Each structure stands twice: as C-alpha cells, then as structure tokens.
Amino acid sequence: MKYPIGIQTFDKIINGGYSYVDKTALVYKMAHYAQNLFLSRPRRFGKSLLVSTLQAYFEGRKDLFKGLAIEKLEQEWEVYPVIHIDMSRGKYYQLKNLHAILNGILSNYEDLYHVGTLSENSDVYSERLANIIAAACQQTGKQVVVLIDEYDAPMHDSMNDEKLQNQIRNVLRDFFSPLKQQDANLRFVFITGISKFSQLSIFSELNNLKILTMKNEYATVCGFTEEEILKKYTEDIEAFAEENEMTYDEAVAALRYHYDGYHFSEKSPGIYNPFSIINALDDKELNSYWFSSGTPTFLVELLQKKGLDMLQIDDLWASDKRFDVPTEKITDPIPVLYQSGYLTIKEYDKQSRLYRLGFPNEEVRQGFSTSLFRYYSPDGMGKYDALCRAYYDCVVRDGDMDAFLSHLKTFYDKFPYTLVNNNERHYQAVMYTIFAMLGADITPEQPTSDGRIDMVLKTDDYIYIFELKYGKDAVTAINQIEKKKYFSAFADDKRKKFLVGINFSDDSRTIDDWSVIGG
C-alpha cells in the first residue's frame, strides 16, 4: 500500500496510485448544498486534500474520479474556472510577507486570464481580484469557483502581535471583499481554516455563509471513520499486528486508543486523525505524529493563569458559545484547545445543551501532558527518561509502586515554589499529568457507589487505587479507601490490586508520606 504521507493534491494521489479513502459523495453533496461554505478542522486533518478534490471536481476532471462514489452521482461534469487561494504557502511574521503572497497569487491568475495589473506590485487587492473573477466568467462563459485554503494562517502567525494582526485583518478583508461584489459571477465559494476570527469578520460581507463545522452530515468529510479504515486498510492492520506481536483485534484496539476519538458534531461518529493513522500503519509503530510539534508556550501559560489543569480540561462541560467562538483575543484557552484539535466533543446533553469536552485520544493526551511536564519540571525533559524507566520497571513490570513513589518524590522536591498551590487538587492534577505523559491507563475521579476515587491506574497485571491527601498523612488516605470500599468496584477483576495512600506536606509542599497495601 502506498500511503499519501505529506501529499495534499488529489490528482497526484490518484495518478500516483496512493491509497485514497473515498470522500467524494460528501464532496458532491457540498457542491450542491449552498454557494458559500466554511469548514474548520484541526491541522493535518485533510483540509487541503478536500480543497484539491473540489478543484478537480469543478474542473470537470472525470478521469480522476473513476470508481469513486461521485462518478455515479454526477452526470454533467461541467467545467468551471477555479481560483485556488492557498494561504498556507508562507509565514506571516511581517506584513510584507502577506503582500508578497497575495501579489503572487493574483499575478498568476492575471496572467492566466490576460488581466492587466493596475500597477506593478499593486496592493489594491480587491479590485485586482474582482477583475480576475469578472474576466474568468466572461472568457469561459461560466460562473467562477473560489477555493480558499487555510484562510486564517496569517492570523495565527500574528497572534502575539496585536498591531500586526489588525493590519493583516484589514488587508484580508479588502482582498476578499469582491466575493460579495461578484456574487452573480460566482458558482461556489469554499473556505477552510483551523479557527474562527471574529465570526469570520474577514468575510463579514459574504452573503449567507453556511458553516459546516458542527453539522452532523459533514462530520466525516475530513479524517477517517473506523469503518473506512477497516475496509481500506485490512491487510495493513494485519501487517501492523504481526510486527507488534498482536492479534488483529488487539491491533485495532491499540490504533483506536491512540488515534481515534475526534467528534465534530452532536452525532458525529469517532474520527481518526488521518495523518497519524497512515503514519502508524506505514511505520508499524504507535508513535506521536500529529503532536510532534508540541503545545504553544503561551497556551500552557494561559492555562496556568486561568487555574485550569489536566483534570479540568479533560472532562469539561461547556456550551458551543464557549468553545466554538473567535480566538484572536485569547482570554479563555478552551476555544483554542478545541479548534486546534487538543480537545474534542465527547458527549452532548440535549436537556442542558452542553457538550462534554476532553482529549480525543492517547496521542493527544500524552503529548499535551508532556508539554505541561516541561512547564512543571525545572529540568525540562531531563527527568523524563528516569521517571519513564522507573514507571515501566516498578509500576508495570514489578508491581512495586513503593519504589516508584521514591522516584516521584525526588521530582516533586525540585518543583519551583511559584508553581505549587496549597490544595489537594493541584497535586492530583500534577500527578495525573505525569502518569498521562508516561502513557499510563490512568482515570481520575472515578465514581463509585460511595464517592469518587482520586485516581485509578491499570496495567496488564495490576490495579492501583489512589487516595491523595494534603496536610494529613498516608494512613488517613488508606483508611478512606478501606472505609468506602473503593476496591470493591474491581472485585471481579483478576488483576492484583494495590491501595495507595499519599500525603503532600503543607510545609515542604512535596510528598512526605505514602503507604502501599495489597499485592
């Protein structure tokens, strides 16, 4: 199987014999749904390939769609002039970079349709784009299709410079203004991006812009469902399973755990990150692919400023008015986390109209916790290797939580004083972050018939039941586990169980006492 890793052009995938998961039925539906559409999805989720597929369709390239769903849906295969505006082709840390990109795009289409430039390197972008659209319509006798990929790339690059961002916004608003003026000459306008900016103020004059982002019927237009993966990549999963000494079902479960879990609407099925899953099948390894670039520092700092931690953002109830909102003035990290793909919809409650948000999968959870660990740890990732080795040797292999807690205490002892809060939940959040970073199967606040267990950690052979205390002692923690019979929730599980009581000193602000019972 040839995997289209890094390939975002539809004709190159088809002509090159690369694997393609058929999304063309949805492409056809989009093309006939409305004139002006907007879709946001996280990075590396197939937005550019979707744009390229739409371009091939509107250019009437029937040969590329042989054997695909759209071949039976489309009868006419009309050819339309297509203007493809790709804003991801550059970096926008200076205003001149934006001017260079826009001039380049316009010059190419002015040459194609023999439109004279108003003046050399003219920055009267609205008039130039309007002239191109009018000329394309006049010369072909067909309405024009405009495809705008990653419209918000300049806004993201300028996020830390308010003056530059305002300048960029004004330039883009002018550049795209002909999309309203030339409405009669337009057959279809499609805009993609990662996030919203002031309710798409850049396109504020565009008539009847339909937003597909949270519509159930388009939830699967980017990314792969498990059904699609099992149908397309059966042999690849078998090869992955053999390489990793798993059964087929175990391999599917492992891939699901690491890369599935995105939901983009109320009724969305689970969606796999396409970039991660094809890389994993190609490498036959469970690595971190999408998250390799890490979490922006400003986002981690904002989480700290707002008092949000891993426990809160991994199980957060919010209305869509909180997370599906503009992000250029970041006062709440939740919209950025959701729109960037760090959080996804886990559940929807119709009565309250609230969504439960959380990490979509293990790749994101582990990657995000690693970013927070860098913030917590005075040595950056210097302590990670030692903790990781201790975790797998002590906790996973030997069932020796006592030995691991000795290593963990050393880490806590070196915490910067300014990062330590005087409450039990803070230490619980940090401990959860550490275990998540280590790839542990860790569940915080697990409900029982008589309360909530602070944390439950499971390995193939062991179950660890944690109770954390602050300013008390480990015996008090163990007594609570026994009194409330937290262990009874796992009575039918044949794995060895351990009760783990940990106390954090209100004086030294580190682990000062622990007790491990069971085995």
Give the label of every model feature segment.
Residues 165-170, 470-487:
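Mg2+/Mn2+-dependent nuclease catalytic core
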Residues 431, 455-470, 484:
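Conserved catalytic cores of phosphodiester-cleaving nucleases, focusing on short active-site segments
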Residues 145, 462-464, 498:
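Structural motif
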Residues 489, 493-519:
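Domain-level recognition of nuclease-like catalytic cores that cleave nucleotide substrates
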Residues 1-423:
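Phosphate-binding site recognition
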Residues 175-182, 335-343, 432-436, 440, ...:
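Metal-dependent nuclease catalytic cores in nucleic-acid-processing enzymes
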Residues 410-443:
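Acidic-basic catalytic patches of nuclease active cores, encompassing PD-(D/E)XK
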Residues 136-140, 434-460:
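Active-site metal-binding core of divalent-cation-utilizing nuclease and nuclease-like domains
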